[in-house]
């Protein structure tokens, strides 16, 4: 029966892709509106596709170099499974494909959303949200399809081990983890490159357009406005999609590997198989329930911000409640060991996700006191806005960190059967909590991708000169999108923390495989005693490698990992600064040299601004991304396994907190500006408004470049460590 249940996984992936195609066709049947609306949307679409084409060329070259390296390691030195190079490629391919399909949908949806808003608010919401659902369903559909494909392929190709029957599933799951590195590598380039692009355009448009020229946002007279709208798609759609594709696959694969490891050496292959497929089944049922939630989202015509939020919240909450019930049923039918408490670990993951989302909303939405106070600080100038925003971001880390810590302890405690010594099942519980948090990704990512679609729709309506009523509706949709985007960023960061911890535990399992490939049969433990490699527990490996806080190699790795988070942020912030400087100079040049732009008599050179952002992003994204890949390899060669574990712990702990701080500071600065633009503290054009625009400009790379990229840095370093475990075990200096 258990084998039959597995087929639910590929079936759910196909269902997600079919529904994504259905929503895409439904959106394409809507009218794009007036000729001017079509022209503007075409400019944005052309710019977005041009950027993506250039990005994939660079990513393709990086992938080619890495595939050659992995092939040498696998076929030349036998340091990896021979399937690794191909698995790595498929992970990157499907991650890139999900970003491409989601962005293509978003660029076609913006004008259609603006045009639908001419009819009614609900019609605009439906078009934007269903278009966002294409991204959500494509990500989960392709992710589960890739996982199903590799599981079935490796199950057929890897022979059974009669001497150690539980070894086969360990080899399968650790090999599958390597396609997660492909997804992580592609995601980092998408996030960093997209973030640099969108913020260079945004900062240039805001500083020169709003502050210097005094023209509104999305005004067609601003040369950077098309590049700004393109950036919303490449950063917030393609980048976010690749980020969450990686988290989704990574959490499922890491949990499956931990499930296999929990039963290593027991001979209980039946229970081991159940532990491996449980996260896949939870994700599969989550797809079905996400689809139900998507269909449940609708609102009334006279709805305000609260009703719009409630409409999206109802769909997401419905899916979450149903997945809780379904998880208990799945694990009960599956008959997995300790099924009741493992089901509770899934609930813990969902609750942690909700708490982080609500905390993010509280600290970043203009509906609440923290952001309103941030707006008020603009009375004394931009310096106090910056100071207050940094303080707000630091304070906002408290609730998410406490939530994640509670989630780790509770899920470990529940899954281990209230026995902290049962490390294998405890770590499996943490992985299951991460899967639970991401189980309804189909609808949570739909609400996230909705944001940039609504933002672009508002820009299209402004540039097309649609009526005040239409602009009011698109503003309502856009404002809702800013809140869902901020919540989505918090959700992505929280899921990265749990997934990163599960991947860290999976690294130990990959060390087992690496030692076996070297021919090491027995671990000689310090102080006497020995244990067979195949039967060694997590504690045995920690003891063997002396992974303690008194080991200087572990401490050195922790310091390097903590440094990596700050170094990476610094590099990406500076990259945005340099690219934005080029954009500012170009916008000033056009205002100066092209007569009649500000009076509306001449059209700006939009293409030139798009070109500047594209080139800047491509050039600046390479070094930070390659550094993230190189750090675990160099640390492993210098300090061995203890150093790599320290690196991953340091990167995870500092990266998680820093990511929350940056995302929430940036989100609060953005909405503080919007709160003033609603007419508070003097409204648009006032000194307070100018101060909050400066805050928003500083916050742009915080929330859309450096902060979100840290999620991927955390997971990519773990993925690289896992793939390079054989190299670390064989060739480390110490």
Language-model features: where?
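Hydrophobic packing and interface segments
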Residues: 1-734
